[in-house]
Design a protein with these regions (language model features):
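Alpha-helical scaffold domains
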Residues: 1-189
């Protein structure tokens, strides 16, 4: 399957869990399609990019290590995504990367996530937190920053400042996650 066939197939994806799961299995069964999926996902002015992001999220949920050969392209292009539904999936993938990187178990992502890739993720997550984004994107961003911040004190300091500043004006979902993250950060100080 080439990029045009994959693009056509993505027209069949809908927001249902079954649809996203079914299409993620197509990618997982042929990982040579993953770079093509990512190319489509970063056609950020095309609504089909959202469907590609949904599928990619499910690929990463099932097998996060599939992202390793594509980390550079993924991290360098994060900041370009602007559709809300794609941003939610992209921010969730960042959280999955951070969880794998922060895991106590040895895994290939720990070595593959180079400092510059972390910087791209951190920068995008801070942008999502301070700009007008949906709560799901912000929640995944704060989790990612908390996990990646374990390696750098400045990240936690900045995260605490933002969460405390924005706490009163944000939604209940934001507040619940912010309270949990703040508690975790303060317990490590």
């Amino acid at each position: 399957m080439g990029i045009e066939e994959l693009y056509k197939e993505l027209h069949n994806v809908n927001a249902s869990r079954e649809s996203r799961l079914k299409h993620s299995e197509i990618i997982l069964n042929d990982l040579t399609l993953l770079p093509l999926l990512i190319d489509i996902m970063f056609r950020v002015d095309d609504k089909i990019s959202c469907r590609a992001a949904w599928v990619f999220e499910f690929v990463c949920i099932k097998y996060i290590y599939a992202i390793i050969p594509c980390l550079e392209k993924f991290t360098q292009n994060l900041h370009k995504v602007h559709y809300d539904s794609a941003m939610r999936s992209i921010s969730k993938i960042c959280a999955l990367i951070a969880r794998a990187h922060n895991s106590n178990d040895p895994n290939p992502l720990k070595k593959a996530l180079l400092p510059r890739y972390k910087e791209y993720i951190i920068e995008s997550c801070f942008d999502w937190l301070i700009n007008e984004q949906k709560v799901a994107t912000k929640v995944h961003a704060m989790e990612t920053l908390f996990l990646l911040g374990k390696d750098s004190n400045w990240i936690h300091k900045e995260l605490v400042n933002i969460l405390e500043r924005d706490y009163q004006t944000q939604s209940a979902g934001f507040q619940a996650r912010a309270k949990r993250i703040l508690r975790k950060i303060k317990s490590t100080l």
